[in-house]
Amino acid sequence: MTDKAKRFPLSLSSLSEKAPRNGARSDPQHVAGKTATPQTATLNASRHGKAPVVPRQQDVPHKIAAPTAPRSASLVSDAIRKAMTARVAKQGVTDSKVLAAMEAVPRHLFMEPALASQAYIDASLPIGYHQTISQPYIVARMIEVMRNNSNAGVLNCVLEIGTGCGYQAAVLSLVAKEVYSIERIKGLHELAKSNLRPMRVANIRLHYGDGMLGLPQAAPFDGIILAAAGLEVPQALLEQLTIGGRLVAPVGDRHQVLQLIERVSKFEWKSSTLEDCHFVPLRPGTVT
C-alpha cells in the first residue's frame, strides 16, 4: 500500500486488555468462541432525531497515536490485520487509502470476547440484537465504491445507515472528514458509543433514530452507505446526497444486489448494479 496507515488516538494495551463484559480477558488469538454466521450484513436503519445541529468541523485532522501495547502483543495484532487487509486486496479492493484504514482499525475490539479469535476472518459475526458486523471485504468494497467519485476521492461529510457496533464508522473516520452514523436499535447505539469512546475519534457523530429518514440537519452528504437492504432506497436519502455524491446500498429481498446511486443534478440520479450480496432487512422506526 502506498498510503501509510493512520493510528487511532488510543493505547492499544489499555483497549486490548480491558476487562470485557463477562470479566474474561479479550485475546484475539486465544479466545475460544462461537462460529461465524454466514450473513454478510450489518444493521437496520434508524429514527430521525431532532437533536441540535452540530456545527461542521473544518478539515480537523484525526490521526491515531502509535500503540503502547507490549511489543509482542502489538506485533501479533498488526500481523493479523495486515493479513486480513492482504486478503481483502486479493478479493479486488485496490484503493490504498481504504486498505490502510482497514489495517489500522482493530476489529476485535468491536465484538464480544468469545468471538475475538474470529475477528479477522472474512465473515460477518453476531453483535447481538439479531444483527451482525459485516465481513471485512464488504466494508472495504462499499467504502471504495463511495470514494471513487468525481472529487478525486475526497469525502467531506458521509452518512452511515446502521451503526451497529461502530466498526464501519471507525473505518470511515479515516477516509472522510466527518462521519454521521444512525442506529435504530438503542442497545446497539449504546454499544457503539461504548466501543468508540476509548478511541477518542473526534470526527464521528452517532445518532439514535430512523435511518430511513436520513439526517437532513447535517445534509448534504458526499457519500451515504446503507448497511441494511430495502426493496428500494428511500427517497429521503437520495435527496440528502450532494450533487456528484454517491450512495452505496444493498437492494432486494431474497436476492440482493449491491447498488451504486450517483446524484447527477438536483432532480436526476443514475444507478448501477455492482454484485450480489446479503444483508439484514432495512426497517423503519426505532427499537428501545
From Swiss-Prot:
This is Protein-L-isoaspartate O-methyltransferase. Residues 36-45 have a biased composition (Polar residues). It comes from Herminiimonas arsenicoxydans. Keywords: Cytoplasm, Methyltransferase, S-adenosyl-L-methionine, Transferase. It catalyses: [protein]-L-isoaspartate + S-adenosyl-L-methionine = [protein]-L-isoaspartate alpha-methyl ester + S-adenosyl-L-homocysteine. Disulfide bonds: none annotated. Catalyzes the methyl esterification of L-isoaspartyl residues in peptides and proteins that result from spontaneous decomposition of normal L-aspartyl and L-asparaginyl residues. It plays a role in the repair and/or degradation of damaged proteins. The lineage of its organism: Bacteria, Pseudomonadati, Pseudomonadota, Betaproteobacteria, Burkholderiales. The active site is at S134. GO terms for cellular component: cytoplasm. The gene is pcm. It is found in: Cytoplasm. One of its GO terms (molecular function) is protein-L-isoaspartate (D-aspartate) O-methyltransferase activity.
